[in-house]
Every structure is written in C-alpha cells, then in structure tokens.
Amino acid sequence: MLKEFEGQMPKIDKKAHAFESADLIGKVEMKEYSSAWFNVTIRGDVNRIEVGRYSNIQDNCCLHVADDYACIVGDFVTVGHGAILHACTVEDHCLIGMHATVLDGSVIGHGSIVAAGAVVTKGTKVPPFSLVAGIPAKVIKTLDESNLDNIHAQAVKYKDLWSCLLYTSDAADE
C-alpha cells in the first residue's frame, strides 16, 4: 500500500515493484528494477528513504529514518528477510543478512556483507569490502572484489523473480 504522509507520496519507478502487502509511506523513492517484497514497511515520515537500482528489500523488512538521518540503500543491494535498516546508508553491492539490524548514522561500505542477526550499532562506519558479524557487529574478514559478482547476481536474480511472479499472476488472472 502506498500512503501519503504530510503531502509526500512514495515514488516508485515504473520498472520497480512493491508487492501489495508492502507498506510504503511518505518520502520514499524506489529506483528502476528495485523491489519491496511481502510485508515490508518502508516509512519515510520525518526524513527520506531511497532504494537504489536492482536492490531488493525482502519479506518482513523494516526501513525507517530519523530526524537527522535519511535511509539510503545503494544499487544492487540485497536486504535479507526480516532485516531492519534504521536511518543508515548502505552503499552499492552490499548484502544485509536475514534479521540483521543497522542503526542510525551507520554506513555500510561498498561491497560489504552484514551477517545474519548482526547488529551494527549507531554511527558505525563499516569499511568497503568487509564482512561484519556479531552483537555489536565487528569486522571479521576483509573481502575481495570477487564477492561483487555473487552480490550482483543475487540482486539481478530477485529482479527476475518478481518479474516472473508478476507474469505468472497476470496469466492466472486471464
């Protein structure tokens, strides 16, 4: 459901998709080929949220903002089931694991992976090409650029999945 908040309506590129059970509220922009899956909440009430090209926000995720921080998701980012992104920045080609939490003012550097269940605490700056895990999340490994191919492929796969689901749904309605 798209919901206006204080005169701001979510903007979804015509080549992006939000499933019916996803709630997008206020200052939200979804760029081309991005997707918001089932039961996602993306609430841009007191600041803005941007979801980059080919990025996918999987089932049961929550994206929110703070007065001082927007929530920015770069291009080719996968945000795993049940993750929470609160007023943070996730740079391009990142993977946020299932049920991970990234808190206010944090920046996840290009090509990084946040492990499932990790909690990235307020203001943390994760260097590019890092694997972080734990509570609080710490860098446990430096990654190389070979991981970008897998992260990129995962993002493209989710674009293909939602396209396939829509096509199958449309065919069933006929």
Task: Describe these PLM feature segments.
Residues 1-15:
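Extreme N-terminal tail/first-helix region
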Residues 14, 19-20, 25-26, 31-32, ...:
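Left-handed beta-helix
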Residues 65-67, 143:
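Short beta->alpha connector loops at strand-helix junctions that form conserved
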Residues 129-130, 138-149:
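Conserved beta-strand-loop-alpha-helix hinge in the C-terminal portion
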Residues 137, 173:
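Short, glycine/acidic-enriched loop or turn micro-motifs at the edges of active sites
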Residues 152-166:
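A charged, well-structured terminal subsegment
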Residues 167-172:
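Conserved small/polar residues in nucleotide/adenosyl-binding loops
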